[in-house]
């Protein structure tokens, strides 16, 4: 699937053992993501969404953010096979860089990435609010619809401007209105700033404030309504996972934008290397679709009970499913 002919322009280096090992390793990672990661992501993201929607009364604001990330994970899991089976650096590509299919697939990918980043940032800010001011109205699940509308509406509006640049760079010769919007790199720069820099700064700000609150010994720290330590561990693990897996993708977008914006011809060697690393960064980004729900499954203490209540409501023929069904026990174990 993968090729490392970007080492030089001859392609003879592909016979070297190091190149063969690299090709084999990346191909195995891609196949592992398709065979294991995609089904796990679809399964656990769907369970996360259904279990929380079924237990709306016990949902908290962190659960709302994880539901948004799970919906974005479902979209990414559905897109992963098409992206991973046809990167431009592979032997078999399903589309060209400027093709209609690429633009169509880029829309849900960008929206899902923005939703994941926004939800992570809001999760951090909400965690700080709950830590500093327990039982506040702002940290209430009462605002679920407004939060979901803000996250997805903001992601759609943000990606719309980037979509215009992508489309105009493809149909620039057919539409006069696109004459001044033929720069696809502007779309990448917009995504990097609004989709990564802003959420990263918000998350960093929330974590700094949260660390100050945790260091202060106040009477509120003995409040029975305070967040459990497991909630803080889940927050830290989620932030590290999301930004750790998405940072390479946005850094490559930024690097590609800087190189192309110079207006100088780029050597084929470096351009091929850039596309190769870009494909690898997307592989890491897609892996977030199944890593995040697994973190929620194993670090959220209320999820097993929610899943049990959901399974009890599922019909098995003319009777309800038994709570000790083998499949349920395997998921809960």
UniProtKB/Swiss-Prot annotation:
Record membrane topology: Multi-pass membrane protein
GO CC annotations, alphabetized: plasma membrane
Keywords (A to Z) from UniProt: Cell membrane, G-protein coupled receptor, Glycoprotein, Membrane, Receptor, Transducer, Transmembrane, Transmembrane helix
Pfam families: 7tm_1
Disulfide bonding pattern of the chain: none
Gene Ontology MF term list: G protein-coupled receptor activity
Transmembrane region(s): 31-51, 66-86, 103-123, 147-167, 190-210, 234-254, 280-300
Glycoprotein listed as a keyword: yes
Sugar attachment sites: 8
Oxidoreductase is among the record's keywords: no
Superkingdom, natural source: Eukaryota
Cellular compartment(s): Cell membrane
Protein's GO biological process: adenylate cyclase-inhibiting G protein-coupled receptor signaling pathway; defense response to virus; regulation of cholesterol biosynthetic process; response to interferon-beta; response to type II interferon
Main location (coarse class): membrane
Residue ranges annotated as Extracellular topological domain: 1-30, 87-102, 168-189, 255-279
Family per similarity comment: Belongs to the G-protein coupled receptor 1 family.
Purpose: G-protein coupled receptor required for the regulation of plasma cholesterol levels. Receptor for CHLSN, a gut derived hormone which mediates an inhibitory effect of intestinal cholesterol absorption on hepatic cholesterol synthesis. Cholesin-binding exerts an antagonistic effect by inhibiting PKA signaling and suppressing SREBF2-controlled cholesterol in the liver.
Protein name: G-protein coupled receptor 146
Gene: GPR146
């Amino acid at each position: 699937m993968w090729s490392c002919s970007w080492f030089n322009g001859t392609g003879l280096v592909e016979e070297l053992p190091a190149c063969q090992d690299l090709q084999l390793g990346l191909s195995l990672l891609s196949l592992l993501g398709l065979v294991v990661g995609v089904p796990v992501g679809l399964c656990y993201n769907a369970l996360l969404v259904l279990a929380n929607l079924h237990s709306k009364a016990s949902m908290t604001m962190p659960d709302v953010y994880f539901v948004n990330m799970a919906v974005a994970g479902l979209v990414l899991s559905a897109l992963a096979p098409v992206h991973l089976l046809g990167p431009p650096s592979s032997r078999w590509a399903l589309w060209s860089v400027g093709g209609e299919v690429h633009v169509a697939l880029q829309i849900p990918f960008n929206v899902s990435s923005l939703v994941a980043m926004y939800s992570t940032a809001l999760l951090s800010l909400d965690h700080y609010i709950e830590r500093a001011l327990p039982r506040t109205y702002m940290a209430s699940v009462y605002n679920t619809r407004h939060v979901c509308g803000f996250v997805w509406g903001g992601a759609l509006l943000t990606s719309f401007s980037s979509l215009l640049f992508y489309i105009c760079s493809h149909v620039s010769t057919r539409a006069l209105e696109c004459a001044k919007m033929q720069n696809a790199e502007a779309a990448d720069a917009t995504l990097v700033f609004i989709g990564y820099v802003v959420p990263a700064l918000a998350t960093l700000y929330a974590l700094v404030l949260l660390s100050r609150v945790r260091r202060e010994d106040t009477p509120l720290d003995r409040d029975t309504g305070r967040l459990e330590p497991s909630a803080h561990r889940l927050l830290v693990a989620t932030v590290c996972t999301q930004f750790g897996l998405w940072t390479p993708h946005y850094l490559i977008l930024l690097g590609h934008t800087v190189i192309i914006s110079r207006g100088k011809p780029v050597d084929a060697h470096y351009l091929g290397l850039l596309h190769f690393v870009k494909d690898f960064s997307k592989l890491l980004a897609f892996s977030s679709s199944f890593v995040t729900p697994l973190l929620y499954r194993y670090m959220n203490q209320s999820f097993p009970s929610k899943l049990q209540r959901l399974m009890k409501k599922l019909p098995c023929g003319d009777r309800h499913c038994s709570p000790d069904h083998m499949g349920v026990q395997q998921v809960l174990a």
